[in-house]
Amino acid sequence: TPHPTPFEMETAAAFLYFKEEQCDVVLIEVGMGGREDATNIIPKSLVSVITSISMDHMKFLGNTLEEIAYQKSGIIKNNGLVVTAKQENCVMNVIENECCEKNARLIKADNVTEYEISLDGEYQRENAAVAEEVCRHIDGVSENDIKNGLINTVWHGRFEKICDKPEFIIDGAHNIDGAKRLKESIEKYYGNRKIVYITGVFEDKAYKRIAEITAPLAQKIYTITPNNPRALSNEKYASAISEYNQNVEAVSLDTCLLYTSPSPRDRTRS
């Protein structure tokens, strides 16, 4: 038997902890994919949740949306309940087929929430609609609980403003869908503003497509090399970006911060 991976051991430890703590409800996020993921060992769930599916982790999950959707839909349980976000037609077909095979009930949260939410970004309204629908199928959660939860949600690193002067937004977009959502949010909230773009990426991501989607939005781009063995070099990323925006410069993170930081008296945390 192969030795368990660190993630598998962490998952086992987490399940043991949840049992010892006698948790009422546990929210479990898949590590990668779903069908073959360690978290999918549980035989039954209150609800299986599938958020927006896009091209990511192709080395492990497949090279088409349908293949990735097949892996993701593996979390669907026999006779279970499934809530899914808005999906591409080809993805929804895979999810519907899996539900049919397992006699699972499918709810499509394909609108946006009507409640006020604390997070910027139109895609967050879509995410909130999914969360809203899930909560409606958990005993003891009222509409008022849902409303209060959405307005008080904090999600670091997702179109998060961390500074006012200048306005400094951080976002963890690392795949094609995330890049598209970031573009939508920038155009909606900062369409008439000068954008300075600081970016770094892992080499195993679809960085050329990410560059194609986001680079034209900026007046100036600085590329950095993330502190990670999987990192794409700043020079290589700058070369990819230059096809879509010539005003790009590969720098160190320290240099970049010197270029872009306001004076200390101007810094105000939001």
What are these regions (language model features)?
Residues 52, 87, 199-202, 226, ...:
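Cofactor-binding loop segments of dinucleotide-utilizing enzymes, especially the Rossmann-like FAD-
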Residues 259-270:
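Single conserved hydrophobic/aromatic residue that forms the stacking wall/gate
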Residues 21, 25-28, 36-49, 53-54, ...:
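Nucleotide phosphate-binding/pyrophosphate-handling subdomain across enzymes
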Residues 1-43, 61:
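ATP-dependent carboxylate-amine ligase catalytic core
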Residues 35-36, 42-102:
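Conserved catalytic-core segment of NTP-binding enzymes
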Residues 2-5, 82-84, 169-170, 196-198, ...:
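Short catalytic-loop micro-motif centered on adjacent basic/acidic residues
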Residues 2-12, 23, 75, 81-92, ...:
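Phosphate/pyrophosphate-binding catalytic cores of soluble transferases and nucleic-acid-acting enzymes
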Residues 88-98, 103-107, 167-168, 176, ...:
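C-terminal helical cap/extension that packs against the catalytic core
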